Design a protein with these regions (language model features):
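Basic, Lys/Arg-enriched alpha-helical interface segments
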Residues: 1-90, 96-118
Length: 118
């Protein structure tokens, strides 16, 4: 999703940082809601994903999803799917393309996704 007039300008990755891309319109809207509700925590999420989207240092906050949610398809390619806990309820889900060093945000919301409630 390319930025449009009036959109925030994302900083480009520098050095070893990963590129962050929004994969869905819903994720773009949810990211905006997270920024409005918890800007500091959302910023920390952004920095963590740029630095190391595969980090296992804080598994309560950032972890790979399991079972049927462990992978998802984007553009015909299957990618590992991870989740980052931004707030008590807010989550970001992302796919990792290691070859392109790109993180694709596929879900962002101030609410916990319902598909993990069962």
């Amino acid at each position: 999703v390319s930025p449009k007039r009036g959109d925030d300008v994302p900083p480009p990755p520098v050095g070893d940082e990963w590129r962050l891309r929004v994969a869905t319109n819903e994720a773009a809207k949810g990211w905006g809601n997270l920024c409005a509700e918890a800007s500091g925590k959302t910023r920390r999420c952004c920095e963590a994903l740029r630095r190391d989207p595969l980090s296992m240092s804080d598994p309560d906050r950032q972890h790979r999803l399991r079972g049927r949610l462990a992978t998802a398809v984007l553009g015909g390619t299957e990618h590992p799917q991870w989740e980052y806990e931004v707030t008590a309820g807010g989550r970001v889900r992302y796919l990792i393309d290691q070859a392109k060093r790109t993180v694709y945000l596929v879900y962002a919301s101030t609410r916990h996704p319902k598909d993990t409630d069962t």
